[in-house]
Each structure stands twice: as C-alpha cells, then as structure tokens.
Amino acid sequence: MWSYVWLPLVALSLFKDSIIMAKAATILLPSQTGFDISRSPVCSAPDPNLNYRPVIGILSHPGDGASGRLSNATDASSIAASYVKLAESGGARVIPLIFNEPEEILFQKLELVNGVILTGGWAKEGLYFEIVKKIFNKVLERNDAGEHFPIYAICLGFELLTMIISQNRDIFEKMDARNSASSLQFVENVNIQGTIFQRFPPELLKKLGTDCLVMQNHRFGISPQSFEGNIALSNFFKIVTTCVDDNGKVYVSTVQSTKYPVTGFQWHPEKNAFEWGSSKIPHSEDAIQVTQHAANHLVSEARKSLNRPESKKVLSNLIYNYKPTYCGYAGIGYDEVYIFTQQRSLL
C-alpha cells in the first residue's frame, strides 16, 4: 500500500524539478542577447557642482566621554564614535576639531571640511561655549559668501545654538526626557522640503508619528511657545517636530534654518544604529532607517560644498590618525570614544 502513496510524491518532485530546469534554461548569456560585450559601459559624468569626497568636522567635547573611567587628564576631550560612524555611513570622511587646541589650528582644520557636527554632552559655558559660538559664526560667514556648508547640531549642540541665536542662556527649562525613546510629532502643515525628512518614505514618516523610533536623552528643552516668542529664534529656525516628555510637557525636537543648511535635533539620530549601552535605544529596522536617512541628508548637503582643500592636509588630519577606545563593557554611556589628550597639529 505504501508504494502507491510514494509514487505520486515522486512524480510531484520530478515535476517541480522539471519546472526549475525549464526556468534555468531561459537564462541567457550576454552573447545570446545580442549585447556587445566589447563595448565599454557608459557611466554618467560626475556633476561638477557636487563634491564627491566630502569631509565632516566633528567638534570634540570636554572630558573622556566616560565620566573619567578612561582618562582623567585635565585637557582630555572626546568624540563618541557613533557620530563618526553617522558621517561615514552617509559617505563622508571625518576630521576631529579638537575644541581646546590652539584656535589658529582649529580654524585651519575647519577650512578642510564641508560640514560640521556639534555633538551631545554637558558643557554649556567657558571655552567650549565660546568655540561653538565662533564656529557657528564662521559657518554662517561661509554660507553668506556663497559656500553651502551644513551643520548638524545634536542635543547639546542644538541647545547651544539656541542660546547663541536667542542671546539667552536661560531660555531652556527642565524636561524629563532621560534615556527614553519617543515618536516625533510634525508641526501641522509643515513643509518638510529642504529638511532631514524630505527623502523619508511616506510609510516611515507615518511611523515616526506613532512609533518610538528616536532616542531622547536630555534634562532640558524649550517649549514651542518660548521658541516662537523669541524673535531671533523664530526668524532663524522653523519648528519641524515636537515631542512630549515623561511629564506631558511639549518641547521642540527638530528645527531647520529657513536660510542656512543648519539642522537642530533635541534627539539623537546617531544612536539607533551605533550605540548599545541602553536597552531603551530603538534598534528596529525602521529605527535604523531613521539613522541612515539622517546620515544621507547630512552628507548630501555636504556634497554641495565646493571647498576642495589640499588632499595631503586632509589625509594628515582625518580621524583615521586616531584609535577609538572601547568602553561598552561598562554597560552605560557610549560604546566607543575617540579621546584626545594631546594636540595633533599636522596641517
């Protein structure tokens, strides 16, 4: 009896194999299609108005990035490797801008880059604040002179630019948004063209408003009312998104300059793909897409910069001249950081 059961199964298997073989037989070699394989492929000419070798400058922040666990040197500064990876994943290289090196050297390095990231952190006064202010003013000057030069101001970076533009260091209020993921609420009728969100797929834009796809980690924020109530701020930026903290207070979460390629984030676009120290960081496929689109937008803006510095100077100052330190074993904070304790002036 069992032989009769197996016969149909064998026949079915042979039938499937014959279908697969028939499909395989329809695959043609280039010589069978009439395609001239001796002809060289036609590649589109590069756009002369774009820079296909962009470099992003990232400003270092005071301290070792690990609360002194890695270095207690008084002159130490650091850059979390996630910011470097953000720029690199968009197709750029990185030059560290060491905040406490001689200003002459720092601003010569600024001439080697096509965009800047101002990172998260805690320093809101002293030399760091003054350097951020000077970099910001130089970036505006370069844009006013006709060079397209973007800034990504993330978390603390956004807070500092807000203080500088508003000329009010007390404009932020306490918020409860530490170590938590959130959605983003788009301002009604906001035009996202020219913003980080312009190339997001419609489905991802929709999910941003309903799912927790971005990481928040800050104790301060600015309400839309305070933001719009400051003439300097409302003239410079438009509010793109808001968020709600753990106590129900609404704060500004994404802004875009109406005149310059300057984007401000209260949230962290770099963490989803590149930080693992907190279980709250979203790592879903949608969350990773958010990080990738943020990287792509920054570098696409940097490609519009026609600054073409001497190659040797760029190579001598790239982040590749430094080694990151792994600190993820602590289970908190950053996974990797670049620590700078000596000025490296190789211009």
From Swiss-Prot:
EC nos: 3.4.19.9
Catalysed reaction, written as an equation: (6S)-5,6,7,8-tetrahydrofolyl-(gamma-L-Glu)(n) + (n-1) H2O = (6S)-5,6,7,8-tetrahydrofolate + (n-1) L-glutamate
Assigned GO CC terms: extracellular space; plant-type cell wall; plant-type vacuole; vacuole
Gene Ontology biological-process entries: tetrahydrofolylpolyglutamate metabolic process
Catalytic residues (UniProt): 155, 268
PROSITE patterns recorded: PEPTIDASE_C26_GGH
Ranges that cross the membrane: none
Subcellular location(s) per record: Vacuole; Secreted, Extracellular space; Secreted, Cell wall
Record InterPro entries: Class_I_gatase-like (IPR029062), Pept_C26_g-glut_hydrolase (IPR015527), Peptidase_C26 (IPR011697)
Biological role: Cleaves the polyglutamate sidechains of folate polyglutamates in the vacuole. Is important for polyglutamyl tail length determination before vacuolar exit. Plays a role on folate stability and intracellular folate content. Has endopeptidase activity against 4-amino-10-methylpteroyl penta-, tetra-, tri- and di-gamma-L-glutamate substrates and is responsible for the production of folic acid, also called pteroylglutamic acid (PteGlu) from teroylpolyglutamates.
Similarity section: Belongs to the peptidase C26 family.
Name of this protein: Gamma-glutamyl hydrolase 2
Gene: GGH2
